[in-house]
């Protein structure tokens, strides 16, 4: 593994136009589902997309993309990302620790230094090539992995992070901690997505609120960050993920037919129109927080 010079962006990220982290305050809010759908939407829009899974103890993206039997190969320029799709306009590739574990049942019992070393290797040793977007799927909460990725990406100037929550108050309370973490490490919050906001009936396609709603919107107003949208639970999306290996269509083609695709297309349009200079401000409380040196 090559050592990255202090103050110099990682050479492996030099060809990447936009770097976006996907964050959540707690587990179980569908963060990896949001990462997957963001990647599929951007690819279907014609962009070259890479996805980096740094949820080291729970890597789920190989399963989400139907790549559980794939492996990472070492090429002359570094680790080669696993290809999900390459079409005439866009492309999609993935890197995950899940490709190195072999068996899905293998557990990862690592202390902080080993996790940090693995993340450094993911940042410096992957041959991404030219990408429009690199999406980084992070673990829930604020852990060693978050601190490591923030430090490793500091000089590569990531665009910021998308924070995923669910409508319930227990989830939105944890999101406040995630927002404060982003402020401390100088990571811009690009917006909040309220996931699992309603349930799409598989028979009539009517969307019904099964939880409370509006928690994500209220958070965005409190912290003056963009509200990107709300995403319902659609059983047909789960069915699509489960059956993708046996389908004659590619995952991107199947997703284009999903009821969730238009929702994420609107979210991506909002994201791409953003002014990157918008600060994060808590209207209820405005503590003076110094960024770490």
UniProtKB/Swiss-Prot annotation:
Signal peptide: none annotated. GO terms for cellular component: cytoplasm; cytosol; cytosolic [4Fe-4S] assembly scaffold complex; iron-sulfur cluster assembly complex. Keywords: 4Fe-4S, ATP-binding, Cytoplasm, Iron, Iron-sulfur, Metal-binding, Nucleotide-binding, Phosphoprotein. Heterotetramer of 2 NBP35 and 2 CFD1 chains. The lineage of its organism: Eukaryota, Fungi, Dikarya, Ascomycota, Saccharomycotina. ATP binds at residues 25-32. PANTHER family: CYTOSOLIC FE-S CLUSTER ASSEMBLY FACTOR NUBP2, NUCLEOTIDE-BINDING PROTEIN NBP35 YEAST -RELATED. Component of the cytosolic iron-sulfur (Fe/S) protein assembly (CIA) machinery. Required for maturation of extramitochondrial Fe-S proteins. The NBP35-CFD1 heterotetramer forms a Fe-S scaffold complex, mediating the de novo assembly of an Fe-S cluster and its transfer to target apoproteins. Nucleotide binding/hydrolysis seems to be critcal for loading of Fe-S clusters onto CFD1 and NBP35. Required for biogenesis and export of both ribosomal subunits, which may reflect a role in assembly of the Fe/S clusters in RLI1, a protein which performs rRNA processing and ribosome export. Its cofactor is [4Fe-4S] cluster. [4Fe-4S] cluster binds at residues 201, 204. One of its GO terms (biological process) is tRNA wobble uridine modification. It comes from Saccharomyces cerevisiae (strain ATCC 204508 / S288c) (Baker's yeast). The keyword ATP-binding applies. The modification Phosphoserine is found at residue 291. Changing residue 207 to A: Does not impair function. Belongs to the Mrp/NBP35 ATP-binding proteins family. NUBP2/CFD1 subfamily. This is Cytosolic Fe-S cluster assembly factor CFD1.
